[in-house]
Design a protein with these regions (language model features):
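C-terminal interaction appendages of subunits in large macromolecular complexes
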Residues: 1-230
Length: 230
């Protein structure tokens, strides 16, 4: 039946666990890893994992929070990874961690703006994705070719995976992918599963979500309506 976390950690009234992370057993490797924090209000912070190496039984303050804000997710990442933030109203934003978020040296900070939210919206999840240097035209070409190959093999997922990413500059110029480049992109492809509060799901290729600078409104990840809910 397990053991109640309240018996392991001195949680205060109303305090909840937001993330549980699996760490390498060899703590000498921790210096190459970082922790990324995301809050409900759209802030994000990046710290070296070693900043949290020595934690006593009473815990440590992990992040400074404004009134009403809370941490929604914590993840292990490297500087060359992308972070994907998604909101309750179906927006998402993706950016390169090492370029867009400076490495904080302490824990007494609320971080920087990751995504700009509309009134009433909030961040509900964060995911870490492989960063792949691919032009808009290459990504469109890969998605089209991947969908064609799935249809040729009778893979029903071809109808839900492989849609073109939101139109952006250079995406309509076309690209000819060599077999080697197609294989390279395929090896780095990941999939994002977005599920609404009413149980509707959308499976999206990581190449459908373009990278941008942090702090913007992002793009539509999933349509929010009466059928789907948030």
């Amino acid at each position: 039946t397990g053991k109640a976390l309240v018996n392991l950690l001195p949680l205060e009234a109303g305090e909840v666990i937001t993330s549980i992370l699996l760490l390498p057993e060899d703590n000498e490797t921790w210096a190459s890893l970082e922790l990324v924090f995301a809050t409900r209000s759209g802030n994000i912070r990046r710290n070296s994992l070693t900043d949290f190496e020595n934690i006593n039984r009473n815990g440590k303050i992990a992040m400074k929070l404004d009134e009403g804000d809370r941490i929604v997710s914590v993840a292990i990442a490297r500087p060359d990874d992308d972070v994907l933030l998604t909101t309750a109203q179906g927006q998402c934003i993706r950016f390169l961690i090492g370029e867009e978020v400076r490495l904080f040296k302490g824990r007494d900070s609320d971080g920087v703006r990751g995504i700009r939210l509309e009134d009433g919206d909030e961040v509900i999840s964060m995911a870490i994705l492989n960063h792949v240097d691919a032009s808009p035209a290459e990504r469109v070409a890969y998605l089209k070719q991947a969908a064609q190959m799935r249809r040729a093999t009778g893979d029903e997922e071809a109808e839900t995976v492989g849609a073109e990413p939101e139109q952006e500059e250079g995406a309509d110029e076309g690209a000819d992918l060599t077999p080697e480049r197609y294989a390279e992109l395929g090896a780095r492809e990941q999939f994002v599963l977005t599920v609404s509060e009413r149980g509707f799901g959308k499976r999206t290729s990581s190449y459908e979500v373009r990278t941008s600078g942090r702090g913007g409104k992002g793009i539509v990840s999933m349509v929010v309506n009466d059928r789907n809910g948030n």
